């Protein structure tokens, strides 16, 4: 399997994951206790179009414009910021994935976007080290880094996108 910028951890900046888990759990618990709908996480909200200059997804202006056009044409697919419940569940799921990593025996290629600010590259590195320690396969015992790429590898500029696709196809040739 080839994974493009997998969410094995969320990029939280300076906040430790354990603190983010605690805060998100407390916020989710309190909203459930009060019978409220799960609110957005702090600083987040409904879909708010982001300019190309400020986007965290791609360096390719045409692919970004296409993505934005889809959101304009089909508002029902627009994604806003994460809810507290989503964050809590995502943090739990990524922790569980890391815990179960040594049991994975399927050969894996982790394609890592070097300039990713959405998911944690550090956790991808840890994941590959855990697989290597368990004598399982993460191609090269480390992620395959696409230098300069943002999160959406398959929507990046052609030279970055082609590098990601070529790496995946070569991996599939070696692991039929």
Regions found by a protein language model. Name each.
Residues 115-119, 134:
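Acidic catalytic loop of the alpha/beta-hydrolase fold
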Residues 1-78:
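Alpha/beta-hydrolase-fold enzymes
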Residues 106, 120-131:
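Short alpha-helix in the alpha/beta-hydrolase fold that links the catalytic acid
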Residues 78-100:
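Active-site nucleophile elbow and catalytic-triad environment of alpha/beta-hydrolase enzymes
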Residues 134-176:
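Catalytic active-site module of serine/aspartate enzymes centered on a nucleophile-bearing elbow/loop
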Residues 2, 109-111, 144:
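Hydrophobic/aromatic beta-strand patches that form the interior of the parallel beta-sheet core
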Residues 104, 110-112, 116:
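Short beta-strand/loop motif that positions the catalytic acidic residue
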Residues 101-105, 130-137:
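Short, conserved loop/helix-junction motifs that constitute active-site signature segments
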């Amino acid at each position: 399997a080839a994974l493009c910028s997998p969410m094995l951890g969320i990029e939280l900046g300076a906040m430790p994951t354990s603190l983010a888990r605690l805060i998100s759990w407390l916020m989710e618990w309190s909203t459930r206790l009060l019978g409220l709908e799960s609110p957005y996480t702090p600083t987040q909200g409904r879909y708010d179009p982001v300019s190309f200059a400020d986007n965290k997804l791609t360096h390719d202006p045409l692919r970004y414009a296409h993505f934005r056009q889809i959101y304009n044409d089909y508002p029902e697919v627009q994604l806003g910021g994460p809810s507290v419940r989503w964050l809590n569940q995502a943090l739990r799921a990524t922790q569980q994935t890391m815990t179960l990593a040594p049991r994975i025996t399927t050969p894996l290629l982790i394609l890592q976007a070097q300039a990713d600010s959405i998911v944690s590259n550090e956790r991808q590195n840890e994941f590959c080290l855990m697989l290597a320690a368990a004598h399982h396969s993460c191609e090269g015992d480390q992620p395959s880094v696409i230098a300069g790429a943002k999160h959406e590898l398959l929507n990046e500029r052609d030279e970055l996108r082609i590098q990601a696709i070529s790496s995946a196809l070569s991996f599939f040739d070696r692991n039929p």
